[in-house]
Each structure stands twice: as structure tokens, then as C-alpha cells.
């Protein structure tokens, strides 16, 4: 830019608009012009930096693998810029050539089985620089319930449990499989009460519930041991020959000892 026919005095130049992709610098640049020097030429130089960029990276907190499909909001604290982005297959999203300033980045939604991070991050973007913002998320926890015979350790199939979140609204019921196992994955973080509700006819119901706390990224195991109802076999034989005798009738009744104190 050339300014002609200037008069003596202090001149200031202020940038009002920068080329596309560059930051405008509103800092005045001053020069004193002395016309007594004749046709002397004065040169003023202004430097512009490229607009900054922001790269957001989203990974699994335990494995470090990228998490695609995460939606994040970006809002300027020092200006009016606002937008949202979704991480790609590599778990990242890049905003190029956005205004310099201070931004707040918030996680809005995540794919299953991850838990949304409630932590905002603040980042300052400086002209000509690319700043990284890294979010790490944990998977929702899992719960394993095992049911075993207290005498033999063998699994017990067909036992139904009620699983209730103590500090939340989650509730479900499930029944042990042939391995005596129930597995619930991707359930909310929190404290749970597990109550035995129904057992096969030969198993004695356990009336004492168990409680467990599930934290993000972990699987907890709760084991119930139950006694199996006893069985009674009666054999009737000939006292001389030892041969079995059929059609004998017996009266079976439950009895107990009664203790009294003096």
C-alpha cells in the first residue's frame, strides 16, 4: 500500500481486514514523517499470522484406541464462534482456520459402550498455531453373577436374580445359564443390590442380598453359594435273605429337638 502527499507528523496505520486464512492485527503501527527531508520514503511493515487450528482427539482411557462417532461442541469464550464436530475413524476432528481466542470444548454424546465425560476443557488458540485437545473415556462397567453349590462348587442353572441400582433408576432381572452365570455389560456406574428371587425346586433360596459398586471401565463379580435340599432314600429288605421287599409303606415326618432352660 502506498500513501502519497503525506504531511509532516505522526501517522498510524491500523489493519481492519486480513486476507482469507489470516488473523487481522488491530495493533496500530506508527511512523513519524518529517517533510524537511525532501522526498524521503518511509516504510511500514505489518506481519500477519495464519488463523489457528484446533485438533480434538478422543481415545479409550484403558486401551488408547481411537473412538469414532463422538460429538463435541466448541464455543468461543472471547468471541461469537460456535460449532460442533464428530470424530472420524481415527478418533479425531480438526477445525482449521478459526478465530484466535479462548474456547470451551464439551463432549455432547459418545457411542456405546462409552460414558460421556462431564469435564469441559478450555483451550487458548494462538495465531499460526495448532492446539490439541484430548478426551479419554471409559466404557460402561459390567457385572458378573455366579451361582454355585456350597458343598461341591458346581454351578447351579436356573436361578433368577433382581439387580437394582441403589443410587439410580436402573433395574433388571436375569437367570443363570448352564454355567451358573449371568453377565450384564454396559450398565450404568453406581451401587447395586442383587437379590435372589427364584431357584429350582431342589435348591434352597438365599435370602441375603449382596451389594456391589461398579466403576467405569471395570467388571465386578458377585458369587452366591447355595445349599441343595437334602434327599432321603429308604431301602426295605428281607432280614434273612437281604432281598428287596416291595409295597412297604412308611410314614415320614419332620422332627426337631426342643431345648428348654431351667
Residue ranges of model-derived segments:
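Short Pro-Gly-centered beta-turn/loop motif in secreted/extracellular proteins
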Residues: 2-12, 94-104, 183-193
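Beta-strand-rich extracellular modules
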Residues: 16-18, 59, 108-110, 148, ...
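Structured interaction patches on ligand/partner-binding surfaces of diverse proteins
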Residues: 18-45, 110-134, 138, 199-223
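A short, amphipathic beta-strand motif
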Residues: 54-60, 72, 143-149, 161, ...
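A short beta-turn/strand-edge loop motif at beta-sheet boundaries
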Residues: 63-68, 152-155, 241-246
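Short beta-strand/loop motifs in extracellular/secreted proteins, especially
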Residues: 68-72, 101-103, 157-161, 190-192, ...
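Short, solvent-exposed loop/turn segments in extracellular or other extracytoplasmic domains
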Residues: 87-92, 176-181
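Conserved small/polar residues in nucleotide/adenosyl-binding loops
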Residues: 259-262
Amino acid at each position: 500500500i502506498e500513501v502519497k502527499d503525506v504531511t509532516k507528523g505522526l501517522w498510524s496505520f491500523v489493519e481492519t481486514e486480513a486476507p482469507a486464512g489470516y488473523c487481522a492485527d488491530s495493533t496500530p503501527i506508527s511512523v513519524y514523517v518529517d517533510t524537511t527531508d525532501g522526498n524521503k520514503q518511509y516504510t511500514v511493515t505489518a506481519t500477519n499470522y495464519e488463523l489457528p487450528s484446533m485438533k480434538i482427539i478422543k481415545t479409550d482411557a484403558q486401551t488408547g484406541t481411537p473412538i469414532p462417532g463422538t460429538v463435541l461442541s466448541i464455543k468461543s469464550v472471547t468471541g461469537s464462534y460456535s460449532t460442533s464436530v464428530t470424530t472420524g475413524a481415527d478418533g479425531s476432528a480438526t477445525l482449521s482456520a478459526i478465530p484466535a481466542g479462548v474456547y470451551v470444548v464439551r463432549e455432547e454424546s459418545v457411542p456405546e459402550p462409552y460414558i460421556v465425560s462431564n469435564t469441559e476443557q478450555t483451550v487458548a488458540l494462538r495465531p499460526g498455531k495448532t492446539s490439541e485437545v484430548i478426551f479419554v473415556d471409559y466404557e460402561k462397567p459390567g457385572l458378573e453373577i455366579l451361582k454355585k453349590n456350597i458343598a461341591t462348587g458346581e454351578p447351579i442353572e436356573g436361578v433368577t436374580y433382581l439387580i437394582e441400582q441403589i443410587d439410580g433408576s436402573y433395574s433388571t432381572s436375569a437367570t443363570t445359564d448352564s454355567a451358573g452365570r449371568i453377565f450384564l455389560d454396559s450398565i450404568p456406574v453406581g451401587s447395586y443390590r442383587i437379590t435372589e428371587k427364584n431357584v429350582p425346586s431342589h435348591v434352597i433360596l438365599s435370602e441375603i442380598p449382596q451389594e456391589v459398586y461398579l466403576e467405569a471401565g471395570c467388571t465386578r463379580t458377585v458369587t452366591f453359594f447355595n445349599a441343595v435340599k437334602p434327599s432321603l432314600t429308604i431301602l426295605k429288605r428281607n432280614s434273612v435273605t437281604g432281598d428287596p421287599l416291595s409295597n412297604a409303606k412308611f410314614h415320614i415326618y419332620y422332627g426337631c429337638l426342643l431345648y428348654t432352660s431351667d
